[in-house]
Amino acid sequence: MKRIFTTNLLLLVFVNILIKPFWIFGIDRTVQNTLGAGEYGIFYTLFNISLLFNILLDFGLTNFNNREISRHPQLLGKYLSNIVGIKVALAIFYGLFTLLFAFTLGYANREIVLLLVLVANQVLSSFILYLRSNLSGLQLFKLDSLLSVLDKTLMIIICGMMLWTKWLPIKFNIGTFVLSQTLSYVLTAVIAFIFVLKNSGKVILKLD
């Protein structure tokens, strides 16, 4: 068990060293230069607003789930049915609270639309972390490690094609950048959900 944990920890470190520096110095820096200080500043401010109430999306559910699935893997289906329903309710509450906060700050129109997408991205990111907690609870550490960088890998591919090639004839701007993140999160969430369902069986949403 100790050997498995060490091996998977090394894998996690390796994939992060491989992907994240390229994201920071390759994509993120190029995005800043392409968008300009003004546009990127709008994105950065709204992104921080979407992060501000991020705790409302989880309230410790992910850690609780990871601990319980590690102890009782046979209850995955039961926990999944209940927690997914709770996560949906928390996502709605978080979204409404964040948008209300933005309105009180005077944001409107374009900024609110952009914030709405960023809020959706935070919801997806939180859901991915929850799904990964099921996989790590089932001792599927390698799969969890790969999923931990899948969204960034997809972002690198999508943004790279828009920034450096003509394969995607789409004008790169703050909107397409945020939507490319949404697409990356959606694909990652779908893949993670498929693997979780393989181990849980049929799921019926509940709020017990």
Residue ranges and their predicted role:
Residues 1-23, 77, 81:
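N-terminal membrane topogenesis motif
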Residues 21-26, 44-68, 122-128:
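Small-residue-rich midsections of specific transmembrane alpha-helices
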Residues 27-52, 112, 174-179:
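Interfacial/gating helices of multi-pass transporter permease domains
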Residues 125-148:
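Cytoplasmic helix-loop-helix junction between adjacent transmembrane helices
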